[in-house]
Amino acid sequence: MRHPLVMGNWKLNGSIHMVHELIAALRKEISGVAGCDVAIAPPTVYLCQARHEIGGSRIALGAQDTGVNLSGAFTGETSPEMLKNVDVKYVIIGHSERRTYHKESDEFIAQKFGVLKELGLTPVLCIGETEAENEAGKTQEVCARQIDAILNAHGAQAFKDAVIAYEPIWAIGTGKSATPAQAQAVHKFIRDHIAKQDAAIAEQVIIQYGGSVNDKNAAELFSQPDIDGALVGGASLKADAFAVIVKAAAEAKAKK
């Protein structure tokens, strides 16, 4: 059975004081919660501090992005080897903010995916459609294209022990969210699409939902059979709200 993952993407938020306070509160809030994996992805400059703050807890460390080069004259980049060196486990790639603001292509994201897998890091591949694409009925087409970039470059086996996060772009940071039924339909499509190449891999791949997940809608989302946790934005900056989401994922798994 798949183990849900709830991961907090802190985006461009944080300070030394905030990292300390938030992790301390989060450790207290989720102490004793089982049945759900938990990770946080702070800004890169706070990874080492976060590693120290989560020490001895069940919280795993994530990163918000990675470069594809391991070393060299690449000013401003962070290599996946560096992330591994500070005990990062999960690495978010393909987030819509990277695709939009940094013009990252499906092929470039597939390159990142491959490098992470080679180093034993877990890619968290973000996919999803814009509001215009959603209204035009192109959700499945867009998600298939983004998944196919990985399948074509690396094969279905690359999704073994990987994570996919379906994040409809129109729901990120907007307060809007797909209904549980809408999200489930897309998650099932993603799983079925991978299953065309490898049913066993498709069955075990974790597919998170992202896009204005909060403490109010998490439980209903997680009740759906193909939703395996969440990639959480704004709500991950509040320990109590994030903890409610973690607990909802754990409770939903116990019922499945």
From Swiss-Prot:
Function: Involved in the gluconeogenesis. Catalyzes stereospecifically the conversion of dihydroxyacetone phosphate (DHAP) to D-glyceraldehyde-3-phosphate (G3P).
Subunit structure: Homodimer.
Catalytic residues in the record: 95, 167
Record's keyword annotation contains Cytoplasm: yes
Recorded GO CC terms: cytosol
GO biological process, one term: glycerol catabolic process
Name the record gives this protein: Triosephosphate isomerase
